[in-house]
């Protein structure tokens, strides 16, 4: 660990956030603040940037509302900026300048104007997530007053700062234990953002993490609005996630199938265990894993690259210019319980009942099945839809022309049992639109 520098003779005077009011080039401020929110470092038009919100005891207004202050870090280099991934950690800043942006107080931290920062843990009982320094003495309280990350090669620290940190941690633990700190996310706001293709935030619980390769993994999440999401993450950017974590996910967008899109500024933040919001999310969000086995495969590579369209959009607002769509659904049941009704005779114009009878002239025995399905990805859509299965190539090795054969029927019965086991299985299929109906095409049962 780089050595701590001796304190300068003219020591730093730290300001309460509410007392910072004078705006000017010559006015520089030093302060401590508890992190309420933060972006990941990202490249702006000319510089790398981190935006965050901080608070201290002076930020509490009448009624207990927290008036946070925006802090923006600027640098020519990514490495000079703080990576903040926990609500409640503490940031110390030297030489910030005040400006008002959109009528809000903003403290600018310009690393190329000799500004500096340090990050401290907000709870002595929980280790730092990504420490820049090692715990050299091996004690549990090593990071209580030692920053776990800082700008530059070294940091200065004076004796009176120990009390500042101690008091700030005491206040934040009390405030966070009795207040949610971050705003609840509304389902309507998410829907509006997705419609407008803009960013939104989530409060969510990790239900599953699976490795893709040495660089990435896939995470499944249940959120506070009852929706399920998936995301592909870089392990290096978010290395500390584990199953069961409750999180604030900042500034993401999403595709229609609820797969999240993480931009360079998107961030994932944890909460301290004493936080009221942590306890509420932990108990209120389901831990059930919404991962099932796909029992089908799409037979063309080009079709596999198609975006997944929610069933609700297919049936209520489809793209009129397109005929083929890709969708994922769970089969609740077949429209008829009688296995004999699964096969019909089609003469090219209309269907004829078969039921073991002789096939009408110029007619072909085909599957004639109506599947009652629900959307696999979009759990918030509680509607049931009808999908038609009349493609003989869907079940490999089961030919409707052999329907009178007992072995064929037994094989079909087993396949349908798997297909309709919606608790553990789902279908990924290409659907062809025929007026208001959708038929499975270019898809095979595994």
Swiss-Prot record:
Record keywords: Chromosome, DNA-binding, Nucleus, Telomere
Record's keyword annotation contains DNA repair: no
InterPro entries (alphabetical): NA-bd_OB-fold, POT1, TEBP-like_OB2, Telomer_end-bd_POT1/Cdc13, Telomere-bd_alpha
Top-level taxon: Eukaryota
GO terms (BP aspect): regulation of telomere maintenance via telomerase; telomere capping
Cell compartment(s), UniProt: Nucleus; Chromosome, Telomere
Keyword Nucleotidyltransferase carried by entry: no
N-terminal signal peptide: none
CDD domains: hPOT1_OB1_like
Predominant localisation class: nucleus
GO molecular function, one term: telomerase inhibitor activity
Pfam families linked to this entry: POT1, TEBP_OB2-like
One CC-aspect GO term: nuclear telomere cap complex
Subunit field text: Monomer.
Family as reported in the entry's similarity comment: Belongs to the telombin family.
Described function: May function as protective capping of the single-stranded telomeric overhang. May also participate in telomere length regulation during DNA replication. Binds specifically to the T4G4-containing extension on the 3'strand and protects this region of the telomere from nuclease digestion and chemical modification.
Record protein name field: Telomere-binding protein 51 kDa subunit
Organism: Euplotes crassus
């Amino acid at each position: 660990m780089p050595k701590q520098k001796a304190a300068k003779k003219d020591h730093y005077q730290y300001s309460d956030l509410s007392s910072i009011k004078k705006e000017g080039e010559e006015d520089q401020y030093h302060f401590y603040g508890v992190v309420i929110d933060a972006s990941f470092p990202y490249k702006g038009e000319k510089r790398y940037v981190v935006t965050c919100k901080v608070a201290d005891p002076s930020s509490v207004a009448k009624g207990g509302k927290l008036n946070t202050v925006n802090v923006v870090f600027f640098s020519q280099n990514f490495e000079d900026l703080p990576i903040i991934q926990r609500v409640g950690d503490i940031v110390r800043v030297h030489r910030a300048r005040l400006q008002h942006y959109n009528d809000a107080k903003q403290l600018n931290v310009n690393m190329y104007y000799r500004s500096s920062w340090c990050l401290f843990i907000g709870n002595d009982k929980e280790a730092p997530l990504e420490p820049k320094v090692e715990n050299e003495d091996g004690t549990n309280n090593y990071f209580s007053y030692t920053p776990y990350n800082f700008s530059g090669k070294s940091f200065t620290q004076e004796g009176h700062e120990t009390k500042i940190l101690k008091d700030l941690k005491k206040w934040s633990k009390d405030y966070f234990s009795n207040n949610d700190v971050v705003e609840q996310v509304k389902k309507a706001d998410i829907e509006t953002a997705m419609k407008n293709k803009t960013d939104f935030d989530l409060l969510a619980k990790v239900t599953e993490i699976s490795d893709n390769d040495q660089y990435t993994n896939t995470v499944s999440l249940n959120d506070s609005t009852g929706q399920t999401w998936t995301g592909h993450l870089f392990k290096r950017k978010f290395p500390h996630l584990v199953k069961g974590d409750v999180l604030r996910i900042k500034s993401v967008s999403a595709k229609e199938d609820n797969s999240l899109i993480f931009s360079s500024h998107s961030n994932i933040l944890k909460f301290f265990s004493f936080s009221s919001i942590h306890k509420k999310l932990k108990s209120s969000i389901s831990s059930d894993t919404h991962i099932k086995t796909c029992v089908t495969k799409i037979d063309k590579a080009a079709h596999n690259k198609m975006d997944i369209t929610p069933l609700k959009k297919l049936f209520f607002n489809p793209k009129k210019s397109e005929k083929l769509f890709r969708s994922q659904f769970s089969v609740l049941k077949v429209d008829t319980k009688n296995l004999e009704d699964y096969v019909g005779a089609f003469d090219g114009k209309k269907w004829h009942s078969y039921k073991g009878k002789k096939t009408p002239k110029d007619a072909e025995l085909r599957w004639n099945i109506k599947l009652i399905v629900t959307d696999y990805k979009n759990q918030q859509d509680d509607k049931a839809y009808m999908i038609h299965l009349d493609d003989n190539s869907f079940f490999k090795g089961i030919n409707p022309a052999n329907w009178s054969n007992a072995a064929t029927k037994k094989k079909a019965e087993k396949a349908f049992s798997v297909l309709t086991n919606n608790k553990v299985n789902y279908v990924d299929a290409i659907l062809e639109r025929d007026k208001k109906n959708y038929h499975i095409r270019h898809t095979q049962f595994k």
